[in-house]
Amino acid sequence: MGCSVSKKKKKNAMRPPGYEDPELLASVTPFTVEEVEALYELFKKLSSSIIDDGLIHKEEFQLALFRNRNRRNLFADRIFDVFDVKRNGVIEFGEFVRSLGVFHPSAPVHEKVKFAFKLYDLRQTGFIEREELKEMVVALLHESELVLSEDMIEVMVDKAFVQADRKNDGKIDIDEWKDFVSLNPSLIKNMTLPYLKDINRTFPSFVSSCEEEEMELQNVSS
């Protein structure tokens, strides 16, 4: 039953902008109600790390990923932008859970493929152009600290783009991307986070605190 009882007992508690009911989020993501509530505890920590307003700002997102809000990375920026569905410069709780759901081991592969396509579509045109592919490749290499010469990067990008752009029109559409990923599944390997399959084990302190809170409520009502 998790913390659902304790949450319902606090109907008057202030909720941040974009807060969505855990039961609703559980119905549209691979997470259970209890796991959504555990993610809310994580969300509260992230959203108050710099600005305590119940929203995750890009600097807070950078801090969570790199422990350094001043370190810029195109890949991290793109993840933030795709999480920010409303495109208002912040990540709300509902957006946080729904987007994380794509990284769940049980999430459908087509959702992971679609999410990855959005990451590479830097200019949000509905297509991935060669320069966008190169920018993302460079960002990923930088993040992995793998050093390649400019010539090697060009060869890598050219080979990938030719393979993906089957229509030879200078851009990769979503259908071409799906085919490309099916031939190169490693492209979405990082789209799965195993620990999301068992949030309760990932955040044991939260689970234990919830159980204690429920026991207290039962004692009060008995």
UniProtKB/Swiss-Prot annotation:
Null allele phenotype: Delayed development and flowering.
InterPro entries found in the cross-reference section: CNBL1-10 (IPR045198), EF-hand-dom_pair (IPR011992), EF_hand_dom (IPR002048)
Name listed for the protein in its UniProt record: Calcineurin B-like protein 4
Matches recorded under SMART domains: EFh
Post-translational modification: Both N-myristoylation and calcium-mediated conformational changes are essential for its function. S-acylated at Cys-3. Phosphorylated by CIPK6 and CIPK24.
Compartments it resides in: Cell membrane; Cytoplasm; Nucleus
Domain of life: Eukaryota
Subunit structure: Interacts with CIPK24/SOS2, CIPK6/SIP3, CIPK10/SIP1, CIPK11/SIP4 and CIPK15/SIP2. Homodimer, mediated by calcium-binding. Binds to ABCG36.
Biological process, per Gene Ontology: calcium-mediated signaling; detection of calcium ion; hypotonic salinity response; intracellular potassium ion homeostasis
Protein's membrane topology: Lipid-anchor
Entry-linked CDD domains: EFh
Modified-residue entries (Phosphoserine), positions: 205
Keywords recorded for this protein, A-Z: Cell membrane, Cytoplasm, Lipoprotein, Manganese, Membrane, Myristate, Nucleus, Phosphoprotein, Repeat
Lipidation (N-myristoyl glycine): 2
Domain observations: The calcium-binding domain (165-176) of the EF-hand 4 can also interacts with a manganese ion. The N-terminal 18 amino acids are sufficient for the cell membrane targeting of a heterologous protein.
Molecular-function annotations in GO: calcium ion binding; calcium-dependent protein serine/threonine phosphatase activity; kinase binding
Entry cofactors: Ca(2+)
